[in-house]
Amino acid sequence: ELPASAPIIDVDPDAAGPSSQVTSPTDLKLFTAANPWTKNVKALTKSSSSDSIINWLSSAGGWGGGTMKIDFGIHVLNADASTPKKSFTPTSEFYTPDCDNVPFPVPSGGAVEGESGYQCTMDGDCHLIVVNKGENKLYEMWRANISGSTFKGGCAVVWDLAKQYPANLRGEGCTSADAGGFPIAAML
């Protein structure tokens, strides 16, 4: 479970972040139902093409900043019933009807991906990811930007953590905050 004393779970614990309290991403324990991203894969046989894919990615510069890594300074925030929710103005990256326009929990002291706060200053993905275990929901938004009292955001998705999603996840044609149809936090 998410520790009540740690409002921020930092997937990049080496980066300067908004909180000194860091919890491992393995402590998230998202999605109670049997979904693909909750399956323990340690005992599975490695794909015969795995090494060649990793070698190709490494020789091509890896992901992002030229390094093979799974973290990019993504903060997974913890919300509870007292966390205020804010409505946002959709940007041109909000795709109706595939995205959810619902108020988002905005925990105090949090940050969007790649930033030390809620303002998206670097023109990056600026994902806002919030887990509310009391609601059993995962909120994810792409290109979130809160500047003063103005909150704008691209595609936003709310995942039901207790739901057993079908093979097409949120449904044919639906997207997600990562544009691939998958929950970001569950795959960190």
PLM-predicted stretches and their roles:
Residues 4-7:
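N-terminal low-complexity segments that are often proline-rich with Ser/Thr-Pro
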Residues 9, 17-188:
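Short, surface-exposed polybasic-aromatic patches that bind anionic ligands, especially phosphate groups
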